[in-house]
Amino acid sequence: MRTSTRPGVRWMPYADAVSPWSNVASRASSALAALAAWSLGAALTVALVGCAGRSGGAGSGAASPAPASRSSRDASPAALATSPVTSTREWTWRGVNGIQVDTHHWTIRSSLRSASFTGSLPAFYEAALRNYRTGLVPLPAPPKRLETCVFGTRDEWARYTEHRLGADAGPYLGMGRGGFTSGGEAVLYDIGPRDTLSIAAHEGWHQYSQTTFRSALPVWLEEGIACFMEGFRQPLGSPEPVFLPWRNTERYAELRSSARKGRLSELRAVLEGSPQSFLAVSRDAQLSYYAQVWAFVHFLRDGDGGRYRPGLERMLDDAVRGTIGERIRACDALDARGKRLAAGAKSGIWLVTVYLDPDFDSFERAYDRFVGALLESNGWDRILRGECPIDLPAPAPEGAP
């Protein structure tokens, strides 16, 4: 997969497996009705209720829920004063009827059957963007509104996918549950509130990087950060989620399951691969890949006493500025051939050498220790609270060897 300001395609099939903590989704969904009123205001919620009764396609999406209750439509003035919504209008596409919601940074087109679910999207997306811009290193605002389509059924999503991707649609139509991003636009469908929002956060990172970064990140970092951005908690009664990168039960469960089943790959294989190359092996291999790059970004941020965080921050800063190539050319740890290969590579260990550690073997051992500690932790309580499941060593003092 390639992150580019030019039209490109990236996608993320999402796990169908139910984690040991699947009841998290039911708790999160209880806040969605109130979220609609706080996020969009009473007028928009009423408009959405009108859309919810339409006939839909014969896809695999969830059945249309009952309209939002009166209490969920009674927005408080204080909440409405901070609404991220700038405009709303009806939206139709080839017989699909829905609503378009514009915020300061997003254009969201929805044919979701649930008014409250649609109502939750503006606040969620604006909070997600703030997380992209602050979760790892300060990053700039996108140069334009980011566009998202969230369909109410898989059938609607499939028809739009064929329209959007043409002859390239086949692999996406064949995946289980998921979404994709093409040319900065994310295309999703309803697979339940919690999972849909997790995919929205993942694909939203791809939208942000495609439109904002001048240099592409390596695949392992692009996908790893997208997974890192998935974790969130929805406080009951709050219009906005709290993003917590460790609160990702699917990735943590998959990491542990892959280890038990002997499916974890060596770090070099992860860095040299891609979601497509792992999917060519099996869907399980691909899900293991996503879990490993999720853990890898946590390692880069916090592992080995925070040793690698400055390099991670430099790489992101250079991607924004478009200066990754300059950094490669200035790297003394690579010879001329290595610099040529690094400049043209979308994956591999080259940027580890440039930004993180010239001694890859030592770097890999540190990563293995970090993942080993995660696997031994069985820290479900901490994961559910959005906390690191292991006790991390304190960062080394500034200037220490």
Roles of regions detected by a PLM:
Residues 168-186, 213-400:
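Acidic/His/Gly-enriched intrinsically disordered linker/tail segments
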Residues 6-7, 74:
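Short linear motifs in low-complexity or flexible loops
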Residues 9, 15, 22, 37, ...:
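Intrinsically disordered, low-complexity segments enriched in proline/serine/threonine
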Residues 5-6, 13-16, 21-49:
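Sec-dependent bacterial lipoprotein signal peptides
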Residues 80-81, 93-218, 235, 324:
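Juxtacatalytic substrate-recognition/specificity segment
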Residues 58-92:
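Post-signal peptide N-terminal segment of mature Sec-exported envelope proteins
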Residues 52-55:
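Bacterial signal peptide processing site
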